[in-house]
């Protein structure tokens, strides 16, 4: 079976075509990276998978259902999540929020709290459950958002640039937390970081209106073709670390 099936899928914002007649599958249990230039349609694909946007034409099935109807079986990790610093919400409360859509106020039962604590263990933050979100570093916050998604016990995990705002050391913790999850669910990871995609996924979908699947690791010629001469971000984390890029402060 397929976790995602796209057949002749198209989508436009007004007169601007973003996704143009694409067909591809993501198999059950498969981890897939989504790469490509800015504005190519990567985040739009995630919105379509979540049912936040509807295709203009073609067919999209997610977990065997029309996109949107399977929303409660999907975990979603956004690029960043912010909470009002004046409201001291705890880490465990944030993780429990992930179950509200599925269970309503039943999300706060003892059983659900145990599931939330288990999700925090999977991302190595079990000792942080009573801390407030504002106390955490950027990397720790991202791992909390993974735990929040995992607490829903999803069949499909979608992530949108989850390491964009964290530094190298935090990213390593993030990778460690995520690597152990691949066997439990299908994963779609949107990222500009080609090294991250190579480490955590089985193949890559290049999105630039059309979609092309690439095996990993990507060769230099393929990378140049994907980004079409546009200025790319620096993908090599080791080089970034050696150059002393600590522009994003993170104590994770």
Language model segments and positions:
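Conserved ABC transporter NBD signature motif
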Residues: 58-72
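The feature captures the beta-strand-to-loop junction immediately N-terminal to the Walker
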Residues: 35-37
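Helix-to-loop junction immediately C-terminal to a conserved catalytic motif
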Residues: 50
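Conserved ABC ATPase "signature" region
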Residues: 96, 110-128
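Conserved ABC ATPase signature
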Residues: 132-136, 140
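Conserved beta-strand-loop-alpha-helix hinge in the C-terminal portion
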Residues: 207-235
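Catalytic Walker B motif of ABC-type/P-loop ATPase nucleotide-binding domains
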Residues: 157-161
């Amino acid at each position: 079976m397929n976790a995602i099936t796209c057949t002749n899928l198209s989508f436009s914002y007004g007169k601007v075509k973003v996704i143009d007649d694409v067909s591809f599958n993501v198999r059950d249990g498969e981890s897939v990276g989504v790469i490509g230039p800015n504005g190519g349609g990567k985040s739009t694909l995630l919105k379509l998978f979540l049912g936040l946007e509807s295709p203009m034409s073609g067919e999209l099935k997610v977990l065997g259902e029309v996109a949107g109807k399977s929303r409660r079986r999907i975990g979603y990790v956004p690029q960043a999540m912010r909470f009002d610093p004046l409201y001291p919400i705890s880490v465990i409360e944030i993780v429990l929020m992930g179950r509200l859509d599925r269970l309503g106020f039943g999300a706060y039962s003892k059983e659900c709290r145990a599931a939330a604590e288990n999700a925090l263990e999977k991302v190595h933050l079990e000792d942080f459950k009573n801390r407030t979100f504002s106390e955490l570093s950027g990397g720790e916050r991202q791992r909390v958002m993974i735990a929040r998604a995992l607490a829903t016990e999803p069949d499909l995990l979608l992530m949108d640039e989850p390491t964009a705002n964290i530094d190298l050391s935090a990213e390593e913790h993030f990778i460690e937390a995520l690597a152990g999850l691949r066997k439990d669910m299908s994963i779609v990871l949107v990222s500009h970081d080609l090294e991250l995609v190579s480490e955590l996924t089985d193949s890559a979908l290049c999105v630039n209106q059309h979609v092309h699947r690439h095996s990993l690791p990507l060769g230099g010629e393929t990378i140049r073709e994907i980004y079409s001469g546009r200025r790319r971000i620096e993908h090599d984390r080791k080089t970034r670390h050696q150059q002393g890029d600590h522009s994003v402060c993170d104590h994770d």
